[in-house]
């Protein structure tokens, strides 16, 4: 969970010897024979998928940008009656060479059929499954509500190659839900690979699309001083991305859904499934599952807790991830639902992509706050304390932190549409039996 400077929750535990910068994947050296029998069976029943485009980018070798100091953004006066500017603080000009290269990225973001830049292949969503998410007028046309009710928040750093897929999928989702019903808020920080320039140039496209777009940059670095203040700084960055929502609550529909998405490669169907399950399950929060090591290892074990109060897999005092393949080892019910790709309740999650109700934010009851256990963990704790404890993981939605990683993840864990194949909206087995009582104890892991 990188936030404007590093948006992925790096595990700082000294005993863990890996990093997320794993060896690049060679797509053509994986075969279906390497997959588990149950996954193989699903693959055999699924339509054939095209091979991914060879991964490359015209900005693969970043051009050195001048050492400009990013504008953190000055504290603004609270105003709940009038909208804030989509550029709340003066933005730097950006690197001219990177600005010249940005139109290719903008074109890819705005056009899902653009093939100039490679990206993760994404299937077209099944409209019948998600049609109920689109507000409709009496004549059947997409209805434009008076106030936005979908708020997309991101903290991004140094990820220009990911933007065609990540932002492109968000744009597709906003078009589906109705652009005027959506708000996009991005906090960027310290990028010199073209991320800043592309996101800045996105303003005119969002204006034409009639999406309210808030973009700002920050000089906050969660890893400054060896990451000693990483958690409070990450919390601050997340709150910056939510500022347009929490500072102007009257501008938003009371039933607004917030999508907070990390620097992951995901598809439109992934985002829509998180929303679909939030609506269908009447959940307060839904999360994907994020993976590393070619989709073999669940990543966000630091933040996520089961309804047993434990991590998704056991990490002993040595800090070793030796048991990472043994998910939900002490929770048979959750393990069964995960293996069946059915939604299951958890005490906390984040997992690369999440959707949650904006109600406690609009009421000023909840915000991200610092704690050594991780700011999303305490965000979920605050949701529970205010009566928003219907938190679920949607195991049909699986993501990775690059196009290559997500391709490997979706080969092993499957695409969302493959995981829900044959499932109907009336399938009672998929419904969660919610537990509303708080847990007595939650495992605390302060040593990450």
Regions found by a protein language model. Give the residues of each.
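Active-site-proximal specificity loops/subdomain of glycosyltransferases
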Residues: 194-252
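A conserved hydrophobic helix/loop-capping motif in glycosyltransferases and polysaccharide synthases
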Residues: 151-159
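N-terminal signal-anchor transmembrane helix specifying type II single-pass membrane topology
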Residues: 1-42
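Conserved catalytic core of nucleotide-sugar-dependent glycosyltransferases
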Residues: 265-358, 362-367, 435, 439-443
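Short beta-strand-to-loop acidic/aromatic patch adjacent to the donor-nucleotide binding site
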Residues: 251-266
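Short, well-formed alpha-helical segments that are part of the catalytic scaffolds
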Residues: 135-138, 159-175
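C-terminal catalytic/acceptor-binding lobe
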Residues: 25-30, 334-448
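Short beta-strand/loop segment that forms part of the nucleotide-sugar
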Residues: 181-192, 218
């Amino acid at each position: 969970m990188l936030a404007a400077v590093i948006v992925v929750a790096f595990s700082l535990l000294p005993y863990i010897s890996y990093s997320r910068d794993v060896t690049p994947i060679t797509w053509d050296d994986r075969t279906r024979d390497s997959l588990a029998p149950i996954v193989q069976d699903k693959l055999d029943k699924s339509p054939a998928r095209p091979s991914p485009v060879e991964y490359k980018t015209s900005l693969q070798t970043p051009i050195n940008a001048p050492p400009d100091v990013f504008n953190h953004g000055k504290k603004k006066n609270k105003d709940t009656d009038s909208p804030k500017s989509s550029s709340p603080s003066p933005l730097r000009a950006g690197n001219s060479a990177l600005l010249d290269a940005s139109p290719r990225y903008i074109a890819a973001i705005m056009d899902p059929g653009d093939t100039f830049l490679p990206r993760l292949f994404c299937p077209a969503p099944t409209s019948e499954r998600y049609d109920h998410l689109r507000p409709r007028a009496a004549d059947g046309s997409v209805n434009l509500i008076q106030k936005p009710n979908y708020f997309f928040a991101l903290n991004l750093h140094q990820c220009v190659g990911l933007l065609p897929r990540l932002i492109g999928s968000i744009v597709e989702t906003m078009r589906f839900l109705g652009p005027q019903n959506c708000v996009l808020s991005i906090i960027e920080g310290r990028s010199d690979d073209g991320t800043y320039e592309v996101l800045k140039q996105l303003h005119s496209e969002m204006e034409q699309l009639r999406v309210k777009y808030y973009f700002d940059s920050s000089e906050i670095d969660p890893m400054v001083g060896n990451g000693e203040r990483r958690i409070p700084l990450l919390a601050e960055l997340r709150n910056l991305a939510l500022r347009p929502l929490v500072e102007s609550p009257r501008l938003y529909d009371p039933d607004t859904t917030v999508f907070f998405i990390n620097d992951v490669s995901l598809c439109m169907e992934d985002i829509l499934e998180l929303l679909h399950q939030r609506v269908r399950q009447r959940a307060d929060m839904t999360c994907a599952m994020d993976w590393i090591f070619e989709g073999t290892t669940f990543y966000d074990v630091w933040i996520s807790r089961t309804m047993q109060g434990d991590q998704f897999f056991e990490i002993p005092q040595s800090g070793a991830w030796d048991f990472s393949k043994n998910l939900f080892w002490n929770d048979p019910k959750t393990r069964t639902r995960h293996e069946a790709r059915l939604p299951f309740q958890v005490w906390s999650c984040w997992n690369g992509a999440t959707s949650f109700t904006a109600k406690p934010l609009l009421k000023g009851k909840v915000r991200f706050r610092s704690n050594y256990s991780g700011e999303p963990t305490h965000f979920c704790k605050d949701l529970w304390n205010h009566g928003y404890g219907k938190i679920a993981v949607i195991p049909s939605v699986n993501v990775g932190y690059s196009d290559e990683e997500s391709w490997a993840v979706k080969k092993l864990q499957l695409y969302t549409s493959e995981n829900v194949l044959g499932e109907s909206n009336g399938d009672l087995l998929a419904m969660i039996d919610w537990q509303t009582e708080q847990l007595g104890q939650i495992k605390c892991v302060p040593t990450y």
